[in-house]
Amino acid sequence: IIISGPSAGAHLTSLLVYDKEIQNRMNVDLKGVIGFIGVGGPYSFSTKTTTAVKLLLNQLFQKGYDRTLGEPCSRMAKSSVPMLLIQSKHDGLIDYSCAELMYKRALEIGNRCELYSVEDKNNTHSWYTAGMFLEKREENKTLDKFLCWIEQCC
């Protein structure tokens, strides 16, 4: 099993895979999980954020709430599950530094992690997080990376 999610799905699935407290509380068994792929996820709320993300965070978290309690980057524990983070420097919604922080944190605690920077011309948030699946892997470097990484895990 390889767990993956785009955007908010990357946020939630990364918590599922790398947050031991959530795993214990929800009785999550990761024995069959051999990889995680996050695509354009908001892994940290302390990085540069767009107005849209700020509005969403203000709706999700009460004023004064410690938002690090909801950050995959802050809650990540040591894990044997390797990680691929796919992020665009031209995302427009989620800043590239979000993925960079997650990548650095993973390496810092000894987790295997790779950060892939989207090179395709269609590199905005909606396009590469979902639209890449509308193309063939020969046409889309990001989709090819996604599929190659899965093939390497198997």
Where in the sequence are the language-model features?
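Primarily recognizes the serine-hydrolase "nucleophile elbow" in alpha/beta-hydrolase
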Residues: 1-51
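Conserved alpha/beta-hydrolase "acid-adjacent" motif
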Residues: 92-101
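Mobile cap/lid helix-loop segments that gate and shape the active-site cleft of serine hydrolases
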Residues: 41-75
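Hydrophobic anchor at the start of a short beta-strand
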Residues: 1, 83, 112-114
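Loop/turn elements at helix/coil->beta-strand transitions in domains of secreted/extracellular proteins
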Residues: 32-34, 80-82, 111
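Short beta-strand/loop motif that positions the catalytic acidic residue
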Residues: 79, 85-87, 91
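C-terminal catalytic histidine-bearing segment of alpha/beta-hydrolase fold enzymes
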Residues: 100-104, 108-154
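Active-site-proximal beta-strand/loop segments in catalytic clefts of secreted hydrolases
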Residues: 6-7, 39-42, 87-89, 118-121
